[in-house]
Amino acid sequence: ETEPLYGNLLTGKSYTVNYTMGWTGDIFDENDVLGADKTTFGLTNGKRGNNASYTPWCSFGIVEGKDLEFIVHLDKPTQVSKVIFGSLFNPAMRILPAEGVAVEVSADGKQYTRIAEKALKHDYPETGRIAFTDSIEFEPAQATFLKVKIKNGGTLRNGVNFEKNNGPEIIPAELWIDEIEAY
């Protein structure tokens, strides 16, 4: 289910994240060498991820208490009123969908103002693999810098939700995010 990305303010924009990416999902066409395009990576390349493929998903191993922060410089003051992103459910691979999202705007990239936040609820089975799409809408705001903070989906139990390993009994779920869009 791919909506046209026209009007998406973030397409092709470079961004920063506060975590190192595992899978970087940076692919422009099927023949592109994964990792070849360093400018936009997988979160603003106009490609939606799906259940069946690990591209163009971007994976983040989350540390408890530290939300994923995604920051885009929009070049000039731009009106924003909606953010959309995808996240993946696949507990066997230690992945849960996002549990919350917050949006902050800034004129200078230093002082940010939080303009919206939302808790996200997903119905999912014990096992399997599902791609969820979430959105958050808010009063139109001016942003030169847009920050999207995404909360991971909680914790998973070693040997219960995923195959037992020597790691800790309870781990923070990884976040696999796809195509953050703003309108």
Annotated model-derived regions:
Residues E1-Y6, R48-A116, I130-Y183:
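Aromatic, loop-rich ligand-recognition surfaces of beta-strand-rich domains
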Residues T20-F28, H122-A131:
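Short, surface-exposed linear segments at secondary-structure transitions and domain or protein termini
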Residues R114-Y124:
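Solvent-exposed serine/threonine-rich low-complexity stretches and specific carbohydrate-binding patches
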